[in-house]
């Protein structure tokens, strides 16, 4: 009677929605593993699960007075994590055929993300052979019974969804000791819980996800600021997005690729959202690529209109670009202000009240944005991402990293770069964190000052950028940082060590590619391995393809929800080339993306980058990693910059060339270091060329195309070469 009454009350108050197959609970041995977001979770499961389970409750809670009142209505087993016999008792309950509910996190989430997973629940599942049914509870975290005060906007009676995920099992891992087996089982259960979160993520477009974040965190919550230091709330950003969308549709058509040549600024974020909600596809142009690069991008993606700013062109010394790329229809944001009519203002006002009505019909799988590869190894390619692939990557990041609305992101990497767009804009926007957009990562003195001034807690960049920030920063500038993430190039040991010594901060290295939106793997506080790029993100499938001549690792191929829709190439303008890769048997399989990177995956799944297939030189039949040549030079001269390339050689096929900013490096010094490091002499270049600075791309990566051309050029000055 009481059970029925409470179920009716909760159904009316919280509009409980049940998703998933309830028939799967008829297993003989059953372990139910829900996430834990509020004090309501146990009551919700007791009322709405299709079976009557036994709850495993920590003894510190089961001994409290209110649990005595619940005892006649809810079966529970006290669980003392300090006593191994308690785990054995739980296994016996399952073996008797009684379904058991265990909260693997052991506590209510204080971040909104998954907390640490205790291995006890995994050991119970593996030892008993029970079927695991993951359950997701969404919405209860917004109630006053959650522990997210100040993180989410509290609501008394939000809608709560309970999702039953497909059943799975967890075999006992093979290991030498019981402790190791238990730890491995816990890691497997963590993977199951992360997969459950990913499978229940909402299917939205970018604009719908933005509106959902606006509702979740509050429309007046501070959201985004730029170098003007004027901070916009979610409502302020919505207003600007609606204004851009209204005007943009006058000179563009639906499904058109609209070029955007804009700096890191609030208006750029508004332009992306504004174009998206009216079915225009922003094509983020690299303003460091020059006229030739812009023309290549325009040809590949069929871009006719470029949105930019006169002020930006003047400050960036790019005023000649419109003349050099005269075939484009250049639209200046400053000129649009005078074109706003009364009808436009009324339209914007109406849709501020009813923002969902502003969006034209579109689906999550529709194209959302065009990014361009760095061009470090050839012509830049247009990479088309859907709404879903971008938001899937955001959710993958949020599943492994505990970002919250308390965080403040310093976003200096350009928004035309996938790293800057997804990690620097979309992730904090969908998390409720505040964003500070800065127009250049190259201002090595200013960025640390702004990190300090804005109380930033999250900073990301390339190894080169982070190393230079460390040079000019005061030891206290980074005192509030929780996450410092390095990507886009290998993290140098010098940079890693200086951050540890000067600031007491561990840099977390990650790995991504534009085609994967971009994050593929990342080290996080919960799972870190030094000199690796971390674990692959949840829901990403991987395989390694053997490459002849390369004995260590294999060529990494990926499949997952964050993979691009396809390429737009200069050679085949306007035609979308869907991702496909050859498997080990040489069969072309759709949906797989070949990264071209040689990696190793250890027994726990940590990924270590060996190098790119294209960054190997073949010397007399032997494959030599150009990155290993660079690392050898770094050990000899850690303060200088080094980049290796290959050149044609009539006797060996190819020969190594080392470009360095250290004029004192000689082959003899490199040979001595190679012998002490166990590096073969074949990997020591004879051609060593001093340069004042390495050619770099806008992302901070070395420009390997230019370096290859430089390597092929004959050495005209004897001082440029040593052997």
UniProtKB/Swiss-Prot annotation:
Catalytic activity, as annotated: a 2-acyl-sn-glycero-3-phosphoethanolamine + a fatty acyl-[ACP] = a 1,2-diacyl-sn-glycero-3-phosphoethanolamine + holo-[ACP]; a long-chain fatty acid + holo-[ACP] + ATP = a long-chain fatty acyl-[ACP] + AMP + diphosphate
PROSITE patterns hit by this protein: AMP_BINDING
Compartment(s): Cell inner membrane
Assigned EC number: 2.3.1.40, 6.2.1.20
SUPFAM superfamilies tied to this protein: Acetyl-CoA synthetase-like, Glycerol-3-phosphate (1)-acyltransferase
Transmembrane annotation, as ranges: 258-277, 409-433
Top-level division of the source organism's lineage: Bacteria
CDD domains per the UniProt record, alphabetical: LPLAT_AGPAT-like (cd07989)
Keyword Cell membrane recorded: yes
Pfam families tied to this protein: Acyltransferase, AMP-binding
Gene Ontology CC, one term: plasma membrane
Keywords linked to the UniProt accession: Acyltransferase, ATP-binding, Cell inner membrane, Cell membrane, Ligase, Membrane, Multifunctional enzyme, Nucleotide-binding, Transferase, Transmembrane, Transmembrane helix
Region of interest called AMP-binding, as start-end residue ranges on this chain: 233-646
Active-site annotation: 36
MF (Gene Ontology): acyl-[acyl-carrier-protein]-phospholipid O-acyltransferase activity; ATP binding; long-chain fatty acid [acyl-carrier-protein] ligase activity; medium-chain fatty acid-CoA ligase activity
GO annotation terms (biological process): fatty acid metabolic process; phospholipid biosynthetic process
Region (Acyltransferase): 15-138
Topology in the lipid bilayer: Multi-pass membrane protein
Family in the record: In the N-terminal section; belongs to the 2-acyl-GPE acetyltransferase family.
Function recorded in the entry: Plays a role in lysophospholipid acylation. Transfers fatty acids to the 1-position via an enzyme-bound acyl-ACP intermediate in the presence of ATP and magnesium. Its physiological function is to regenerate phosphatidylethanolamine from 2-acyl-glycero-3-phosphoethanolamine (2-acyl-GPE) formed by transacylation reactions or degradation by phospholipase A1.
PANTHER family linked: ACYL-COA SYNTHETASE (PTHR43201), MEDIUM-CHAIN ACYL-COA LIGASE ACSF2, MITOCHONDRIAL (PTHR43201:SF5)
Protein name, per record: Bifunctional protein Aas
Organism annotation: Pectobacterium carotovorum subsp. carotovorum (strain PC1)
